[in-house]
Structure formats: C-alpha cells, structure tokens
Amino acid sequence: LHKCADGSWVIREWAPNASRIYLIGEFNNWRRTSAYEFKPAGSGNWELRLDSMFLSHGELYKLFIEWPGGGGERIPAYCTRLVQDDETKVFCAQVWDPARKYSWKNDRVLRRPHPLIYECHIGMSSEERKVSTFAEFRENVLPRVKRLGYDTIQIMALQEHPYYGSFGYQVSNFFALSSRFGTPEEFKELVDT
C-alpha cells in the first residue's frame, strides 16, 4: 500500500491464480465491495487505486482473494505494517501514514573499516520479564553498548513473525517490522540515534 504524491493510494498484488481481489477492512466493515475491488493489471498483477479519503492512518485491512473453487483472507505480500490482535493472535495489515512524519537528524552513516559489531534482540533486551521496545532499547541499552566501544549494532528478529519463541526465525512478512517492538517511527528514531 503506497501513498501517492497527490494523496491518493495505490496497492498492487501479484496473484496469478486469482479471479478477483478485494481490499477489506475497518473502512468497509470487512466486506467485499466493488469500490474496493482490484483490477487486473497483466501478468498476474492486480491493482487498486483509491482517493485519499478512503483510507486513514491506523486502519486495519487484509485482502480477500477469490480463486477457482474458493477464496480467503490474505495479508498483502508487500505490506510494511502488521499488527497482531492480542486475543485472537490474528495478524492484520495496518495503514501507516502518521500525520507527523519522522524527521531524520543524521543524514550520513559513519563507515568504519573494521566495525565492532554488537548483536542484539530488541525484545529480549530488558531485565524485566516482558518484550522490550525500540524506545526502551534506545534509552537503556544503546548507551551501554556505546560505552563498551561498539560502533555497529546487528539487530535480530526485526521482521514480523507470528511466534515470538522462534526468535524471529519464522518470518511471516519480509517488509514489515515486528509490531511487538513499536512503531516504524520509533524504529527510525533508534536508527537515527
């Protein structure tokens, strides 16, 4: 799901065996409607364009894909934000378009010929019995890592994964940060520190 320069939205999906695809979500009460039906774009690609008023930041959505003999709900392959329902554990894509975009402070990356790398896992970085966040890592762990002389961090389990106990090795979406650790803006702030 991409926001265009004019404020409109476009979403594309490659589904060569689909006969129809719909965008379903909070904005249409999770129903298949013609206003949210994708159009074939050739070579198995499908596309839907929407005016800016049709989607809002934070709304949950999925695709409903129909194919010969059936159909079902799917997460878009290239979505960049997923959230998991605390009760059902079901994932939904989430429209991510905050009113206030993150403003980068550091525009250059320091390159070292021999980096000293600290491997870490955001969720396991707290002394408390809980899943830690990007903000907590930035505030509590990063200063200690720097004090120890490390100049590079390698973060494990950044991509969304359904089972936390897998330590992120069972990736379910390659393009979305794990929502357990915080928002994309909080991750940007960590990277910018």
Where are these regions (language model features)?
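The feature marks proteins involved in alpha-glucan
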Residues: L1-V10, R31, E37-E119, M124-R129, ...
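Short proline/glycine-enriched turn/loop motifs at strand-loop junctions of beta-rich domains
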Residues: W14-I21
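Short beta-strand elements bearing conserved aromatic residues within extracellular beta-rich modules
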Residues: I21-L23, Y61
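Predominantly extracellular/luminal cell-surface or secreted proteins
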Residues: I24-E26, E66
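Residues that line or immediately flank small-molecule/substrate-binding pockets and catalytic motifs
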Residues: G25, M124, A157
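Short amphipathic alpha-helices and their capping/turn segments at secondary-structure boundaries
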Residues: K105-R108, R138-G149
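Aromatic-lined carbohydrate-binding/catalytic grooves of carbohydrate-active enzymes
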Residues: S132, R144-E189
